[in-house]
Amino acid sequence: MDDIVMLGASQLVAGFMQRTLSPVEVMRAVLDQVTRLDSVVNAFCAVDEQRAMSAASDAERRWVRGEPCGPLDGVPLSVKDLVAVAGFPTRHGSWTSSPQREGEDAPAMARLRRAGAIPFGKTTTSEFGNKIVTDCPLTGATRNPWDTRLSPGGSSGGSAVAVALGMGPLSLATDGGGSIRIPACWSGVVGFKPTFSLVPAGKAASWTALSTLGPIARNVRDAALMLSVMTNEGIDRHSGIAGSSDYWADYCAGLDDGVAGLRIAYCAAPAGVRIEPAIEACVRQAARALEALGAHVVESDVTPLADYYGDGCMHSVQWSVYFAQRARHMEAAHRTLLDPDLKALADAGEQVDTATFADALLARHALTAAMEVYFQRYDLLLTPTFHCSPQPVPGLPAGLRTAPALTAWCNQTGLPAASVPCGFAGGLPTGVQIIGRRGGDALVLRAARAYESARGAFPAPGATLERPADGMEAQP
């Protein structure tokens, strides 16, 4: 692959500053990469080359004058198609959506744009982000960059694939149950789900109390830089939680301070979840790496999560009710256009009675309280990000598509969590999930960076991709 397209955002900015790279040169290389590869992997549902090149020219002039508009000036950015970007439609992966272009950015996108990031394309998603694979009737299936017969996970699969293949160093995505972390794990990149409400969501999370916006990047430093930009004006008072200085932090500050003295628990094989042996081994190796860096590392069974893994209904009940609510407001003709998986999810939500939903909410509060106690004993927790290697879309059981046990509990509790590549299982990438207490985003990123540094450079997917003829295209 072209070396330029595999540079991280921080490296690009350093090159712009030193005049060894030009925003126009970089954007042109990224767009050429999209042209070369996206017909195979289907990571993008919209690209605006003309606006992107015009914005890159503007950024280049600012760098020549020595007046960059912000810390991401000239950096290409892709955005998941659940997030509003001015000049692009927000289709949500759905035939039921409007093709009309947005007049303004979502709040987090507006902050990234003011910092100089250039949104050049929208990435694919499952319909309304309903499942952890990325396929929908509108855009078809997105393919794993390591093996195009397989899924990259979801619902932010387009974002993860784009970053993995050099189609932009950063992507803005959403996570309602693992939708950032799972595709990051299966694509071999870094994904970070911030503390709930840390990043202003706007309309992207107006209908669910589980989802948050976050970065997908090729390295932890870039994820921290992107998070710093998205939170640099503080959180909106109506949607945020005051009282923690961590909410106002520069997430790049102290990123290289290491993990010496931290209390880190790990659970490589959670009770109630069958983990592939190679994935379990990778997580244990990650724990040993942090121990070698001076952390106090212990194996833990995480008792509160044993009940959650064994039950599994808490997330699926809430998730189905949220989608039932969305479908209820659609015209009858639009409901017939929905992805069958989404329709089945909404139909299941219609069958949930008030008592069952109340029980799910009470269980959520109980788990949140239990994990608050747990994180009084430990600073961080390590688990696998996902229990198995990437699967063919038809091969992933329907239940797992919407209720990922290892990641969804972080959405239930609002805790920050990162997925960092930690090795390979069967020749395919896997990830370790690093979880912190509420508001402890900086510490999660610091540990992720420490592990990343100890691990060394993670390889990129091969440059040769072939699209199999398996009928996983968009449905008219």
Predicted regions and their residues:
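Serine-dependent amide/ester hydrolase catalytic core
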Residues: 11-17, 57, 326-412, 459-475
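N-terminal, positively charged, Ser/Thr/Ala/Gly-biased leader segments
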Residues: 20-28, 34-97
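Acyltransferase
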Residues: 23-28, 57, 250, 277-302, ...
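Conserved hydrophobic/aromatic pocket- or pore-lining residues that grip, position, or stack substrates
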Residues: 30, 52, 74, 80, ...
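Short helix-loop capping/hinge segments that flank enzyme active sites or metal/cofactor-binding pockets
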Residues: 72-92, 256-268, 317-372, 419-429
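Short glycine/serine-rich loop/turn segments
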Residues: 72-213, 267-269, 383-398
